[in-house]
């Protein structure tokens, strides 16, 4: 066991194992996988069309309609550049995303467990998530947000344990929140909680000035990717379309009243 533990101390070995696990699980569970003759998931095809359009002179929301965020379309667009006629490129990006997710899961688990059990937890988590009902057919907005979620949880643990102001962590996590807002902005709840917990921690330590400065660093980091997206749509004369579709449409089109019991049942049925 000691030899195995020493072997698992190597970062490259951990990444290689997680990469192999990601390749195999997604090969089976994602319809972007080359094992599937075609991908019949409507959303995935819509994302691919949007991404393809971006790299062929079309502007999202102006020339093509779909209501997810522009960063998701960019990801699918890069997948299109890898393979014009199949979802192979998207599958490869899924593998990279899933490997990064797994690595941060490992780092979180490693805070409390030894190398072997931390890796085991990470591998099992990857397998369970990819095999769950909520995974759908693979390539969802939520799936591509998983590395952002895991990295932010890890950074939060690190910043709390080190009891450090951590300006770089605030900027990084602000930027991560900005990226998530450009994929699916209603997933931002975690980052509001992240920042609120850190803010009130500093307040409890009577670090009032640092508490407010930390919010500024976080918001600056968050603004950077959002500003880049705004600049893109301004240059392409589509800022109003961007706002009308991605913000207004998403805030109004799916408004429905669901009681608490139904929400809880829906949550467990997705597992």
Language-model regions: role of each:
Residues 105-128, 146-147, 163-168:
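Transmembrane-helix signature of polytopic, membrane-embedded enzymes
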Residues 214-253:
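Membrane-lumen/periplasm interface segments of specific transmembrane helices
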Residues 1-6, 190-223:
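Perimembrane helix-loop-helix junctions
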Residues 168-185, 191-196, 220, 224:
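Membrane-interface alpha helices of multi-pass inner-membrane proteins
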Residues 116, 152-172, 205:
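Membrane-interface transmembrane helices that cradle and orient dolichyl/undecaprenyl
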Residues 34-50, 61-78, 84-88, 237-239, ...:
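Extracytoplasmic catalytic/substrate-binding loops of multi-pass membrane glycan-assembly enzymes
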Residues 73, 87, 101, 123-146, ...:
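Aromatic- and kink-enriched transmembrane "portal" helix at the membrane-lumen/periplasm boundary
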Residues 1-30, 110, 166-170, 213-220:
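Start-transfer (signal-anchor) and selected internal transmembrane alpha helices
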